[in-house]
């Protein structure tokens, strides 16, 4: 298949042959509509194995000239583009077409200052709610410039952790800044011995319970993926050319 290469599967936890698809979904909590998508490949870490393929595999891969079709050229340009930049382009196209939303819900891969800046600068008053990694990113807070793990330790030490019966999680909240933008960080843990996870939002009016409730709507895109795979054979397209793969997903 044209452009196909090795991509890392987070379900199988190993590189597999295929594409990565990114979808933009709109939901009201009941119905969901897929607004846009893009296909991506991974260039690979080794120069002698582009996309994780040996030279013979690369040479044997199907290739086709597309006679300057602008639509295919745009899709091809997306293939190795930054997923953050592509996501912002998707949002721009949707907004131009009249789509309005209250919250953009994203996983930890997309929660970053670039996307945050884009969302809070929109004129119709939308906000970002995203999972954050319990990693090395530092946030400006009244507790100092600390990482998420350092913040939850400080909150535990100061006894600012509460149990929420309604959602069944221990929670903690802290106001912060990232790239000079005010945000709230909400920490959640299931049980006394569970791992801490955290959400970031630009909506300073939310509390931990409401942020949790809103973010849980992101599950609908996982349901949509499952239904597309089961009922519409997503990922089973046998077309060899890239345009055919794009058309198959569009249909």
Where do the model's predicted regions map?
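Short amphipathic alpha-helical "interface-anchor" segments enriched in bulky aromatics
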Residues: 208-239
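A short alpha/beta connector and helix-capping loop motif
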Residues: 2-18, 113-133, 236
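Charge-patterned, long linear interaction tracts outside catalytic cores
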Residues: 184-206, 219
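Basic, amphipathic alpha-helical segments enriched in Lys/Arg and hydrophobic/aromatic residues
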Residues: 234-251
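Active-site-proximal, Lys/Arg-enriched surface segment
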Residues: 1-55, 168
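Short, conserved catalytic/metal-binding motifs centered on acidic residues
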Residues: 1, 24, 104-109, 128, ...
